[in-house]
Regions:
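Positively charged N-terminal leader segments that act as targeting/secretion signals
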Residues: 1-4, 8-10
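Compositionally biased intrinsically disordered regions enriched in Thr/Gly
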Residues: 15, 42-44, 67-70, 74-78, ...
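An edge-strand/N-cap motif at the start of beta-rich repeat modules
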Residues: 44-88
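Repeated scaffold domains used in trafficking and secretory/extracellular systems
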Residues: 54-56, 92-100, 127-134, 161-168, ...
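Short loop/turn segments that connect beta-strands within beta-propeller blades
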Residues: 82-83, 117-118, 151-152, 189-190, ...
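A short beta-strand motif characteristic of beta-propeller blades
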Residues: 86-90, 121-125, 155-159, 193-197, ...
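Solenoidal tandem-repeat scaffolds enriched in leucines and small polar residues
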Residues: 146, 157, 162-176, 181-258, ...
């Protein structure tokens, strides 16, 4: 049997080399067909495999669920019951599941708090953030410090650190900063330090031990009493789990595995090695500069899956997602996945573009059109909902929660809607806004605002056409047909794009709306936020420009340039602006206004680093009142 397995691996490697050659000039669907034809026989060998099953812990029944409502003031969340009836009103800007203690994390007025099942505040919104409860504890952030909430929402007294990680195995990593350096340690569920906060680094507890770095080339495992179990003198030690750790003798690898006693179990031969999970680990020996391939080994270093995959993910419950490359991006390829088990059995064809974690024998997967439930063998569950779009599906409290294309909703098991967010909302009694979904490809999605109720149908058509055109983001080299990006449904894009909008201001036929987006090129360190602001007169359909705010016979550009240059030169909060990058106000300058101020803004990289985000200059109208056309339509409509 071992010989047959090695023969299969040999032919799989040959096959993948051929795939690399054809991926760039074959259509996406043809590639899927070739891969699946190859894997047809290989996958069938495990269908009768009897795998040990872990006992599932039944969770407490949940009877209230967070639900979204779209409004003129932005996203608002409340809670519904299993019948879709609203139990707690839509008043929060974020809302999360109720936990086993009957508490839910909510966000209101840009602060986080806790509510009970009646919607009453258990903890008033006061925190900058609250992490989801784990092991009966939630980590909060307040004024750049972190603390712990117990199961009743009470702060653990005296527990304040610069950093606290989520609890794992009853303990949490904590850190104190001293200048540019940090020291780490652990606290228990009561907030008591089990060891002094003095280590260079600390990892989450796992299987009763925490891995710490004492100093360079000295690592150790610490037990639940804070005692050092063993030390390890290597350049790197990490990813402790299932009694094994990744290690390297030299800085930057190669990597292998040691046991708790510090004995080398698997020699350091890998350029990349992950921790063990369900008895297996993901490794790579790839020296190919074009594409890094991965495989799976067991605790003896034996190959379970050969190093031929572009991506491998642990799915839990003994399942693994194995990805093969698709598309013409050979350095950072997308992957199409099959499901295998930790024994080396391929359970499915390579047909999934996304696969979720297994929980109680169920997962979910997506292809280029739909999302569906998967059973423990990776098969689509026919008697549970299948929905259009891509995202997540989970059984929750006897109903189905779907988060598809960034839109959360609920279904019953017969695929009937229990609750879904509204796709239209009123601006006032006259106008409403329709949320129009544009998704030509699984990796390109925009929600486009469309105005309804403009008296003149031609004006309405013109306004909506312009909003649609401005909403599109067209990357370099992308074709344009009829003012729309020419994106093909089964095209494998080398980027992701998501767009949405928010209303900044509405009053008496006057609308200011932000068209927002996020562009991410595969392999990039960061994506690029996209923002375009439109100020619209809904009576005439006019889109105002910055010049419309000022008197035409004044040198308003010069005064704005002077003010912004002053900010850059004298205000420490703008010290990150690239020297000499501000060239003055442009003809198509991005801006928006409120009742009292003008805001001039620049996207990341334009005049500052990505880390600065969108750089905005706030200019009070009182500072430029001599230049403002206070009798003009623009100013009067938005400030009259």
């Amino acid at each position: 049997m071992e010989v047959l397995r090695l023969i299969r691996i040999f032919f799989v490697k040959i096959f993948i080399l051929n795939i690399y050659n054809i991926v760039s000039n074959k259509k996406y669907k043809n590639i899927i067909y070739i891969i699946n034809e190859f894997s047809r026989g290989y996958m069938n060998r495990g269908k009768n495999n009897k795998q040990s099953k872990k006992k599932n812990t039944k969770k407490r029944e949940v009877d209230l669920f967070p639900a979204l409502k779209n409004t003129v003031d932005g996203d608002r969340y409340g809670y519904i019951n299993k019948d879709g009836e609203v139990i707690i009103p839509f008043k929060f800007t974020r809302a999360y599941d109720f936990n086993e203690f009957g508490l839910a994390i909510i966000k209101e007025n840009n602060k986080f708090g806790l509510i009970d099942i009646k919607g009453n505040y258990n903890v008033n919104p006061q925190f900058d953030n609250i992490n989801p409860y784990k092991e009966g504890r939630a980590i909060y952030t307040e004024k750049s410090k972190m603390g712990v909430l117990d199961e009743k929402g009470n702060k653990l007294r005296g527990v304040v650190y610069d950093y606290i990680g989520n609890y794992n195995d009853g303990y949490a990593v904590v850190a104190k900063m001293n200048g540019k350096s940090s020291k780490y340690g652990y606290i228990d569920l009561d907030g008591k330090e089990i060891t002094e906060v003095k280590y260079m680094h600390a990892n989450d507890f796992n299987d009763g031990f925490g891995l710490i770095k004492i100093k360079d080339r000295e690592f150790a495992l610490i037990d639940t009493q804070g005692n050092i179990s063993n030390t390890y003198n290597f350049e790197y030690v990490g990813s402790y789990g299932e009694d094994l750790m990744v290690f390297s003798i030299l800085l930057g690898g190669p990597y292998g595995y040691i046991n708790r006693d510090g004995e080398i179990v698997i020699s350091p031969i890998y350029c990349d090695a992950k921790g063990f999970n369900d008895g297996v680990a993901v490794v790579s020996r790839s020296n190919n500069n074009i594409i890094c391939t991965h495989g799976v080994i067991d605790k003896l270093g034996r190959q379970i899956y050969g190093e031929i995959y572009s991506d491998i993910k642990h799915l839990g419950e003994g399942k693994i997602a194995l990805g093969l490359p698709i598309g013409d991006n050979s350095i950072f390829p997308r992957s199409i996945y099959a499901i295998g088990d930790s024994l080396g059995t391929l359970l499915t064809k390579f047909i999934y573009l996304n696969i979720g974690m297994y929980i109680n024998g169920l997962s979910y997967g997506s292809d280029d059109k739909k999302t569906f439930f998967l059973d423990r063998y990776g098969r689509i569950v026919k008697n549970l909902p299948m929905v259009d779009g891509s995202g997540e599906l989970r059984a929750k409290g006897g109903i189905i929660h779907a988060n598809i294309d960034y839109s959360p909703y609920y279904l019953d098991k017969n695929n009937k809607f229990i609750y879904q967010p509204n796709k239209e909302f009123p601006l006032d009694k006259k106008y409403s806004l329709i949320i129009d979904k544009y998704k030509p490809n699984i990796n390109y999605l925009i929600y486009i605002p469309q105005v309804k109720g403009i008296h003149d149908e031609n004006v309405e058509k013109e306004v909506n056409s312009k909003l649609r055109k401005i909403s599109f983001y067209i990357p370099a080299k992308e074709e344009v047909i009829d003012n729309e990006p020419n994106i093909i449904e089964d095209q494998v894009l080398s980027y992701n794009y998501y767009g949405n909008f928010q209303i900044l201001f509405y009053k008496d036929n006057s609308l200011i709306i932000d068209l927002l987006g996020y562009y991410y090129s595969l392999g990039a360190v960061n994506g690029t936020p996209i923002r375009k602001t439109c100020a619209i007169d809904l009576l005439t359909g006019r889109f105002y420009k910055l010049k419309d705010l000022f008197k035409s016979d004044t040198n308003w550009r010069a005064i704005l340039n002077k003010i912004i240059s002053g900010f850059i030169e004298n205000d420490p909060s703008y010290e990150y602006v690239f020297p000499g990058s501000f060239k003055g106000i442009s003809e198509s300058q991005d801006f928006y206004i409120d009742k009292d101020n003008l805001y001039i803004y620049y996207p990341p990289y334009k005049i500052g680093p990505y880390s600065a985000g969108v750089i905005t200059f706030k200019i009070p109208f009182t500072q430029i009142e001599d230049y403002l056309n206070s009798q003009g339509d623009f100013y009067k409509k938005f400030n009259g």
